[in-house]
Amino acid sequence: MSKGHSLQDPYLNTLRKEKVPVSIYLVNGIKLQGSIESFDQFVVLLKNTVSQMVYKHAISTVVPARPVRLPSPTDSEHGDSEPGNA
């Protein structure tokens, strides 16, 4: 995994696994809503009443409907550390 994906992939994966509703804002200002069904290096599959394949280069912002906590590398060892308090 490249350096550029060290935050993106765990963030999207947490949103996917926890089925967190998200608003995705595109670079042209359009707002899409749904939950992340899947993603890869280039696209995000957003599920609402239908599934939409959204190219990552068109995404400006991903806004979760509720706060999410990203797993940190030390979580698997300690389980109680807060992100940013390493």
Curated annotation (Swiss-Prot):
Q: Which Pfam families match?
A: Hfq
Keywords linked to the UniProt accession:
RNA-binding, Stress response
* GO molecular-function term, one example from the UniProt record: RNA binding
Q: Which InterPro entries match?
A: Hfq (IPR005001), LSM_dom_sf (IPR010920), Sm (IPR047575)
Coiled coil segments of this chain = none
Q: Would you tell me the Gene Ontology cellular component terms?
A: cytosol
Q: Which residues form the Sm domain?
A: 9-68
Which stretches does UniProt call biased (Basic and acidic residues)? 75-86
According to the record, the residues making up region (Disordered) are 66-86
Biological process (GO), any one: regulation of RNA stability
Has keyword Repeat? no
Q: How does it assemble?
A: Homohexamer.
Q: Tell me, what does this protein do in biology?
A: RNA chaperone that binds small regulatory RNA (sRNAs) and mRNAs to facilitate mRNA translational regulation in response to envelope stress, environmental stress and changes in metabolite concentrations. Also binds with high specificity to tRNAs.
* Family, as annotated: Belongs to the Hfq family.
This one is known as RNA-binding protein Hfq
User: Gene symbol?
Assistant: hfq
